[in-house]
Amino acid sequence: MRHKLILAGGGSGTAEYLLPAAKKALEEVELVIASPRFLELLHARKTMPMGHISELLESLPAMLERESIGIVVSGDPLLYSLCRTLRNRYPELEMQVIPGVGSLQLLGAAFGLTMEQ
């Protein structure tokens, strides 16, 4: 796999929770893969709607031979998300992970609760 992968958390799917670091990194890749709600928030050169994860995992190595890719997932990619799956399946993969604001943080903030409670 010649090119780098950016795995970015998209937060809740609104512009307010898509972090500037994620937007900046995703502008630098050649292809962004995400659900339509995230693709609408980005100004990517080339996009592809997220399909079945199993199909994406199967085709990812060949895709990374051709171009750099950014994948946007809901919430935080480090919490019950795609990061672990990618690391386990492709340990040699060069991947930059950009965290996002997850639903647990949003829920806690809405009720004034800390993550320790």
Where on the chain are the PLM-derived regions?
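Class I S-adenosyl-L-methionine
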Residues: 1-107
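Short, glycine-/small-residue-rich phosphate/pyrophosphate-handling segment
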Residues: 108-117
